[in-house]
Amino acid sequence: RLEKIYRIGKKNEVEGLEKISLDQLAEIEPHCKGVGALWVPCTGIIDFRSATEKMVEVAQGVQGKSNVHLGEEVLDFATDGDGTVVITNKGKYKADKLIVCGGLQADRLARKDGVKLRERVVGFRGDYYELNDHAKHKVKNLIYPVPNPDFPFLGVHFTRMTNGEIECGPNAVFTFKREGYGKTDFNLRDTLDALGYSGTWKLFFSNMSFGINEYRRAFSKRLFLKTLQRLVPSLTIDDIRPGRSG
């Protein structure tokens, strides 16, 4: 699988991509252990909040009448001449063109706009831990495992954030609320939507053991740590603390 990822990276001309020896791995990440590794020096992350704020600034610079409306629920769409009217709980907005980036509500918004969909959004939550200050020296870059191609997840990994914090995770567990970021969050409509969809049960039954293990890890710091130790064996229970969910 590592070799396949390497070939794909080369085909896509990923800058600086190379296969490295275990000695090179030890130089780059002294606390990381593995049987093989790829080094991608051009990889990085961004602060999504800052990036979004800059996009708003640019949009308003290009079109002075541009506005951002927060905290509004889209109730419906309507056609008005050649344009579309977005109806919210606080007003109506008309546009010549409408682009819907609905996130976890994308399927519901599409249906409101008359799109016939068989698919449904099924929510999954990812929990993270963070490294405590005394352990941050154990991770110097971004460290990822070789992903399992059977699942649309990257696997538990280490991310050095723009603010200097280091996130570890996530897991992947079914959530009973689409925007439920707490372990016990629940929404009846979201739950019935998900459990009333045959695709949800197909996913459950074909990945039962994986799902059970993910849930166990969601409620056990020690089990989460064991997964992290596959990449950084020297981590201890005192090195990590609960972080955000997403």
Predicted feature locations:
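A general structural signal for well-ordered alpha-helical segments in protein cores
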Residues: 2-5, 22, 52, 106, ...
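Helical element adjacent to the flavin cofactor pocket in flavoenzyme catalytic cores
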Residues: 38-97, 108
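Flavin-dependent oxidoreductases
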Residues: 77-187
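Conserved active-site and cofactor/substrate-binding residues in soluble primary-metabolism enzymes
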Residues: 46, 50, 104, 153, ...
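Extended, charge-rich helix/loop segments that form flexible
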Residues: 177-211
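General beta-strand structural signal in soluble alpha/beta enzymes
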Residues: 18-21, 68-70, 100, 168, ...
